[in-house]
Amino acid sequence: MANKLYDESSIESLSPLEFTRLRPGVYAGDTTYSTQLLVEIVSNAIDEFRLGHGNEIKVDICYMNEKYRIEVSDNGQGFIPNSVREDGKTVLEASFSVLNTSGKYTEDGVYEGTALGLNGIGSKLCCYLSHWLEVITWRDGKYEHIWFKEGVFSKRESGKWNNKDKPSGTLVQWNPSEEFFNHPEVDMNVIKKLFNVIVC
């Protein structure tokens, strides 16, 4: 068998979405279970809690119609709804779809010593490696609700937020893809250990 020549045609560039879906283990580590996706989203909620924003984080894992739906909600400060960046994406959309987008890079010390997870990567990882993901955030009397399919932005809704009992917060839910994980469910032993460390 002749050796295959390596030339300029062998070099190609992938988008962050394409690369992450081709090599999920680079960011997710062990891809036996989808545990890391939950860890990343929970870590974001914990970062808010540690800064004094909110006092409740809820995790719900549901198995229905042979599909897993994982949900994390908090009553932290939430994202600023409908705040549009120079690239035309809202802050919320970019935070879940544009790699290396984060509010934890500045040197103002706000998150110093508190930030968990893969800053600027974790929420995108969850989006990229799920069949679908949706996130709703609310604050200042407004909300923004966005949907992704296979890591690609699908649609957005926004409007007034009238629930005075929940003035601010964020809810993220997703369906991890079996294409990238041997088992799309989470390893509950790992999650229980993580939560025990956090609450202690």
Task: Enumerate the language-model features and the residues they cover.
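Glycine/threonine-rich ATP-lid/beta-loop region of ATP-binding domains
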Residues: Q173-C200
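GHKL (Bergerat-fold) ATPase N-terminal catalytic module, capturing the glycine-rich phosphate-binding loop
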Residues: M1-P176, F181-N182
